[in-house]
Amino acid sequence: MSVSLSRLERQLGYTFKDQELMVLALTHRSFAGRNNERLEFLGDAILNFVAGEALFERFPQAREGQLSRLRARLVKGETLALLARGFDLGEYLRLGSGELKSGGFRRESILADALEALIGAIYLDAGMEAARERVLAWLTTEFDSLTLVDTNKDPKTRLQEFLQSRACELPRYEVVDIHGEPHCRTFFVECEINLLNEKSRGQGVSRRIAEQVAAAAALIALGVENGHE
């Protein structure tokens, strides 16, 4: 094992028994051979479970939608990339020449994906308890800063954070119709996101309100919120 990977293990707070798992977790798809996408898939599932379980225990009075929004804040790409930068993870990534030249080692999505892959690798290396312990340790500051007040955000913000947590494209809003006189208009808006086959719709006395209604409809269609909160 190289000195550099030993340093990364110290930063992560975990020593791998199988060093090949660690190397694979750091290997981007642009690099020749096997890559970290399968480990990322596994790590994403573990991260969401561990975060959800911890939130369930920490906020016993929270409703389902509130827990979902808190979890989205914890596992979003921005949060994971920030953690990854704290570990200097970009220095250890195995990237293809094109990604290296374009600065892929600094890219938020690549850093977040690699951290999820490391979670998956730790799980395969030592089991669920080891993975849970590391996730909770890494997210201690984020967990301690959460309150239920954080769930009192408007639907557009909640939808954006949910999509960002899954590395999805942001929603696209379009005014498709306007009814009424200038002093008493009704705006009709459609919200399009890649995760849904159909556009979500909203209407209101202003474009802003119509967009919020459309975003709320999208959250319900995604199953993030049930519409009864």
Curated annotation (Swiss-Prot):
Stretches assigned to coiled coil: none
Reactions catalysed: Endonucleolytic cleavage to 5'-phosphomonoester
Subcellular location: Cytoplasm
Enzyme Commission (EC) number: 3.1.26.3
Record Gene3D superfamilies: 3.30.160.20, Ribonuclease III domain
Active-site residues, as the UniProt record annotates them: 44, 116
RNase III domain segment(s): 5-127
KW Phosphoprotein (keyword) present: no
Gene Ontology process terms (BP): mRNA processing; regulation of gene expression; rRNA processing; tRNA processing
Keyword Transferase applies: no
Cofactor(s) the protein requires to work: Mg(2+)
A UniProt-annotated Pfam family: dsrm
Xref: PANTHER family: RIBONUCLEASE 3, RIBONUCLEASE III
Family of this protein: Belongs to the ribonuclease III family.
Subunit field text: Homodimer.
The protein, known as: Ribonuclease 3
Taxon lineage: Bacteria, Pseudomonadati, Pseudomonadota, Gammaproteobacteria, Pseudomonadales
